[in-house]
Amino acid sequence: MGDPHRRLIQMLQSREFPALAPDIEIVPANYFAPLDLKSIYGRSAPLEVDLGCGDGSFLVEIAAANPARDFLGIERLLGRVRSAHRKIVQRELANARVLRVETSYAVQQMLPPDSVTLFHLLFPDPWPKRRHWRRRIVTEDFFVSVHRALVPDGLLRIVTDQIDYFREIERLAAQSTQFLISSDPEPPRAPSTFEKRFSQSEIYRLVLQKVSEVT
């Protein structure tokens, strides 16, 4: 595990920033172990994960529209987590939770295998300068982690307004043997904050379906 991940986990475990509410913000006792999702939600239901959920606008809308499913927003920034928390409380959503941790680390280390029905990756930071490309979330390793966490035939839904980044994601997807390009499932009823902001721009979408190993 890289130093940035370790520093973040140490910060959280020190409770420098206390949890907002234990029934909404997930604060694991062990950040190195998979989450106990049944204990967190009090049931077994299909799980959708909003990677980099921002202020929670998209998260609460899809959670409200789909009470038979559970929803997890993952966000690194405290201010955005507070905003998402507030929205969940205001809407009284029993099926929505938020986890404050680095997104790539959560996917790699904290989500159990075969646990996620659908990942939403909406407008990930494109890091347009070449020297910053290594910071982009979508990499070969990211695809491996997502594949492990998805249920059979599970989906990864990616939305961006950056054509160069989109082409790079397409290239990585085409090289992967773990996913097939799928048609978009029923569009969510509410756009994300970034989708509203970039509504006048060209928006690029890609949905990848997990390919399970043949046994």
Task: For every predicted segment, state its role.
Residues 54:
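Conserved glycine-rich SAM-binding loop
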Residues 51, 74:
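Conserved beta-strand/loop positions that form the S-adenosyl-L-methionine
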Residues 77:
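Conserved SAM/SAH-binding beta-strand->alpha-helix loop
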Residues 1-49, 57-66, 85-113:
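S-adenosyl-L-methionine
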Residues 165-215:
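Class I S-adenosyl-L-methionine
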Residues 152-160:
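Conserved beta-strand signature within the Rossmann-like core of class I S-adenosyl-L-methionine
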